[in-house]
């Protein structure tokens, strides 16, 4: 089972990355193997992912923030592929994130 949350904020307001991680934390349960977020900043997708628990994603974001006022966050329950940061959701390429 995965946890997914999306936030649409206001330009000029606070960025959504911290709120996205908090939203995943509120839905947190045992069993997921990785987590990630993807935000929209100046027309470009900004993605951060980590293997393991949400604390690992928070550590990634502390060192490499994900600016933006719109975003999605996702925890992954592995049904295929190894539990790695590369397999963590969301996946993104170009202008598309899923």
Model-derived regions, located:
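N-terminal glutamine amidotransferase
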Residues: 1-98
């Amino acid at each position: 089972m995965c946890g997914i949350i999306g936030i649409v904020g206001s330009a000029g307001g606070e960025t959504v990355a911290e709120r996205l991680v908090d939203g995943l934390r509120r839905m947190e349960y045992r069993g997921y193997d990785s987590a990630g977020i993807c935000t929209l900043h100046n027309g470009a997708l900004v993605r951060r992912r980590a293997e393991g628990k949400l604390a690992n994603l928070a550590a990634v974001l502390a060192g490499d923030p994900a600016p933006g006022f719109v975003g999605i966050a996702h925890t992954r329950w592995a049904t295929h592929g190894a539990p790695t940061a590369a397999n963590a959701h969301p996946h993104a390429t170009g202008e598309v994130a899923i």
